Amino acid sequence: MTLVILTILILAYVLIATENVTKVNRAAVAIFAGTVGWVLYVCFGMDFVTSEHLADYSRFLHLGDADSTSTTVKYFISRNVFLPWVGRAAEIVLFLLATMTIVEILNNNGCFDFVRQLLRTRSSKKMLWTLAIVTFLISINLDNLTTTVMMLTMMHAIIPSRRQRMIYGSAILLAANCGGALTVIGNPEGLVLWNSGAVTATVFSFSLLLPCLAAWLIPTAMMMRMLPERVDTEWIVMPFRGDDTRLNAWQRQLMLFVGIGGLWFIPTFHNITKLSPFLGALCVLSILWIVNEIFNRKLMNMDAMVERRTPRVLQYGVIQMILFVMGMMMAVGVVKESGAFDDLMNLLGGGEVRPNVWLHGIAAGVLSTVLDNFATAMNFFSLHDVVGLGDPSMILDPNYSTNGLYWQVVAYCVMAGGNVLGIGTISGLALMKMEHMHMGWFFRNIGWKALVGGVAGLAILWLSHTLMGGTIYLMI
């Protein structure tokens, strides 16, 4: 049955990788694989429990003074195997939901209108770097999908030329993905590592700073040659928000400070309380929500308030991303609980000598070019457990301990690989749908540049680890 569950996951990966051909939504595929996998796991629960959780199951029977029956096994799986994976997935989903709602509140109140003012230029190069820099900085604080769609919406309203929109949109995509990979709150992969204790926020960002900058700056600089000297723009009136009077500048600045500043405080909140980061995100959301209602109390009872809406493409993208993350975590969870990953590592000799970290990273990067980078990352993260401080194996191989090299390399490589064809991320799919781009055009004009930047960033990561002896996190 382990082989059947693994086959379902592999077929799901094939459908996810060929979404642009089959037109089957990857979120639906991930959810189907996760639910069917757990149903099969429960149906053959006795085999899995005795092979993977025998000690825990014996303790469960002893404490409950119960006999081992099929019902008892199912109850044990439900409470002790299934629910922990639901909790891990819920931590990521609730964090994403909170941060995306924060973005919606800020955007509806015009807190990002300053970006449109920065884009008032006819210089194509200035437009390119303004879009790229603003996107990179925003994606450091917010998730990359939300940042990508928000910036694409702004850019789409300003630039009428489809070809120029494709180039600028690609620059936005690269900046959002590279910026999101720089922090633990910038994309789901970083959140998974942070929640599992594989990395800490400060060390993770310091380690990937130079590689992410290289992966972003090099292809963006190469894209300058694709643009004319001047860019055609169309300027429209600032968006109507339900009332002729908008929030004052200081009110928008305060809301922006509460939202973005609160997100930056979440790592500190986590370090102090040891509670899950999603609780900190919900706390920030609640404070921002209260401030929003205080500032907009005069509009709350007006029919015009209904006009404050988020673009439909953002709403759809948010729902798709949340469901996809939930489905993939459940699918990978059932495969891990079946023992398939342990068998694979034993087959590769993982019980004695772990495979090379850099080969793992390169393999993850190659897979993420066609397979979703989150799905790829989840599989490679699940191959190894985080080595604790008291574990003797940490001295022999610290690459898999907290802030170990393995987690950094895989996180970086899946980001870099996802930029090559554009289909490796949900953000890339959003860009292709909005601008009707083809994968072939993307690779010929953007993908190979992203590959050059990604390889350069990986070389920088290798050099920094080699020169620092892999001990950079001990000095921070």
What is the predicted function of each stretch?
Residues 26-35, 117-130, 164-174, 317-319, ...:
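Cytoplasmic-side transmembrane-helix entry/capping segments in multi-pass membrane proteins
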Residues 1-8, 87-98, 140-148, 208-216, ...:
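Structural signature of hydrophobic alpha-helical transmembrane segments
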Residues 4-6, 162-166, 170, 182-183, ...:
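Juxtamembrane and boundary regions of transmembrane helices in multi-pass small-molecule transporters
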Residues 37-48, 85-87, 138-175, 179, ...:
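Membrane-interfacial helix-loop connectors
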Residues 56-67, 87, 104, 109, ...:
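Transmembrane helical segments that form the transport core of multi-pass membrane transport proteins
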Residues 6, 28-32, 93, 128-133, ...:
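Hydrophobic alpha-helical transmembrane segments
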Residues 1, 21-26, 53-56, 74-92, ...:
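Interfacial loop-to-helix junctions that mark the boundaries of transmembrane helices
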Residues 3-13, 23-71, 89-101, 252-262, ...:
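Hydrophobic mid-bilayer segments of alpha-helices in multi-pass membrane transport proteins
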